[in-house]
């Protein structure tokens, strides 16, 4: 009966077109429903992390390239793109970031879930405190911009008045976000939050680029004016003042003060973008409970030589800056003497910093402590930024070396060989300092503080035993050693079981090692501040060195410097932050 009924049904469908059409439409409808449900499931599933990272990274990169394209068009000065167009574009980006930060903070407040996971290594409190100080200086700069707009409001675009207001609001909101949310490890709405965080990263990068471009334009304008006054070149300057009278008496003070605050605003935005990038990398990350612990800061006893040497370096830098800026406007002989003074000072500084970093590396060679290879996005980013920002100075240095060697047989300034020595030492100094900082960041710290006055001997064995010993038994042995042993003395587990040969043994007390490293960190810390101050406030003798201008041409050499000097400024300030972190944890 079943077979007969099935045959009849097939016969009816075959010879009845209406029935066949109904069955066909029913099957196609079922197929569409299955396809729709499958597509719905695939869209509602969690988007793959790598795909979300790639999409958001491409969005941010293209956003940055769009902004840089507008800046390059603005650099032509005679083109259709004006400053108000660039500022309007950046203002829109800041408003979008403000909306995202507001939505994120409101959602965090409304959620009744437990406190989100937080990365203990992201955004140390002292870094956020330093950024707060830089933000205050940025707010002062915004106030000067608003005052400048009020004075010239009759002949300049309204975008120049809206921009500082939005920037001030953006700065205040962003500092609040950094203090209360930068450590969050986001686990909900990951794809949406990736785009929000990466938008904030590249918005700050664009603000950094805008600050660098404005500061460079101001420096180049003064540089051309000085060359014209000294008769070095037949150049023409571009009038950068508005074509109307200022309605207040402090417009010139506002415009002049802006460029003394630009270095702080530039460093603020580049550091914020780095911290937000770490937050972006932490989205969806599973934290390691063992490594995600905040280590205590160590003591600072025995600090004398490092701070003293750093203060001498800082005082020397300020003196060189003042003398250089004064003599630069005088006669050609005094101008050449000022440039020579800078290079002599630079050679002495580079040599001292090479010795300091090399001594720190030698101290590390005296201990048998393994490297920390755990996952830490903040530390990885620190290392990558150190190496990437070194490229600017290295390019500038090797160009100077090529120019000095190429002009060796011809008439050259008196400081040509000093410039060659300075360039080579600059390359060496950054190589050694990078090694010292990176090894310090990756060196594993002991969980217990060592007593500097304890009569212990720090023994070094070659080759190291790390990787041979089973660390799983160390905790058990430590527990047994803590128990008092009757009639016997327990040996410290920090000493090897067998005595070392005399040629492979080096005795250094832990307290002495800590003092040496802390003094080195403090000395390098203040030296990097000194080397940041000079170019940040106008001491840039590379522009006044005729060797590179004759070898590469003025346009090529100026382009190299306009790229290399901002990277060098960031390198010095980033080294300051890294060295202070090493100083606290060593």
From Swiss-Prot:
General function of this protein: Proton-selective ion channel. Biphasically modulated by acid and alkali, mediating proton influx and efflux in response to extracellular acid and base stimulation, respectively. May be involved in acid and base perception. Sensor for ammonium chloride (NH(4)Cl) in taste receptor cells. NH(4)Cl acts by increasing the intracellular pH, thereby generating a driving force for proton entry through OTOP1 channel. Plays a role in the regulation of Ca(2+) flux in response to purigenic (ATP, ADP and UDP) stimuli, leading to increase in cytosolic Ca(2+) due to influx of extracellular calcium.
Subcellular location field: Cell membrane; Cell projection, Microvillus
Membrane topology (UniProt): Multi-pass membrane protein
Classification lineage: Eukaryota, Metazoa, Chordata, Craniata, Vertebrata
Listed name of the protein: Proton channel OTOP1
Phenotypic effect of disruption: Fishes display the backstroke phenotype. Mutant fish exhibit otolith agenesis without additional effects on the sensory epithelium or other inner ear structures. Otoliths are essential for the perception of gravity and acceleration. Larvae without otoliths are unable to orient dorsal side up and rest mostly on their side in contact with the ground.
Major site of localization recorded for this protein: membrane
Extracellular compartment segments: 75-82, 148-157, 218-255, 327-336, 406-417, 538-555
Gene Ontology BP terms: cellular response to insulin stimulus; inner ear morphogenesis; negative regulation of type II interferon-mediated signaling pathway; otolith formation; otolith mineralization; proton transmembrane transport
GO cellular component: membrane; microvillus; plasma membrane
Activity regulation summary: Activated by both acid and alkali, with proton influx in response to extracellular acid and proton efflux during alkali stimulation. Inhibited by Zn(2+); this inhibition is thought to be pH-sensitive. Currents evoked in response to mild acid (pH 6.0) stimulus may also be mildly potentiated by exposure to Zn(2+). Activated by NH(4)Cl.
